[in-house]
Amino acid sequence: MASLLIAVIYLIFISLGLPDSLLGSGWPTMQVYFGVPSSYAGYVSMTISFMTIISALMSPKLISRIHTKWIVICSILLTIFGLCGFSISSKYWMLFIFAIPYGLGAGAIDSAINHYVANNYSGSVMNFLHCFYGVGAVISPNIMAAALKSARWNEGYRWTAYLQIAILLVCIISLPLWKKNEVQEDEKEEHSAGIAESLKVPGVVLTL
């Protein structure tokens, strides 16, 4: 059962990597569709990244209050909503609206899974975990390439959303596999830093 859960966790990290390469691979066609300069991709990417940072900074509070499996489910749902939103966007400004759930879905799930694996598995499992993020990041440009060849850029986002839905179903089916007594930090003994406190840590602002 433990090995099955590890497989699901690896699949979750493939899911995490899937949306990240779509904008770059599809933008040359998208910019023509929206009638905007190529540099405008940066604004969309910046919005997604900003929301990911916000989500990641909120993750300590979420992890201490919500079981990891529910953070995973909610995060994948947000990503699916963002991908579907991108696929139906007919105006450039619409991308910014759907970039919000698109980015929020990436930050907390990353931190939550890392936290879970660090507390429940060996370092080798953690190393392989991040390899599977790369698998997802490699798959999505190929999905977009297939969409551009046989359909439109919109389909690249839609097909990726379908793949995310399939992964979500696997996660839902696997809910009983998650440990009931997940290792959590005791808030009374160890304080979880909030956003303001995290930003005060030397080097954090420069890194962002």
What are these regions (language model features)?
Residues 4-30, 34-36:
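Extracytoplasmic
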Residues 21, 48-57, 138:
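Residue-level signature of mid-helix packing/kink "hotspots" within the transmembrane helices
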Residues 54-93:
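Conserved MFS/SLC helix-loop-helix module at the cytosolic interface between two early adjacent transmembrane helices
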Residues 94, 128-179:
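Helix-loop-helix hairpin linking two adjacent transmembrane segments in secondary transporters
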Residues 98-132:
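Cytoplasmic helix-loop-helix junction between adjacent transmembrane helices
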Residues 175-208:
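Juxtamembrane intracellular "pre-TM" segments in multi-pass secondary transporters
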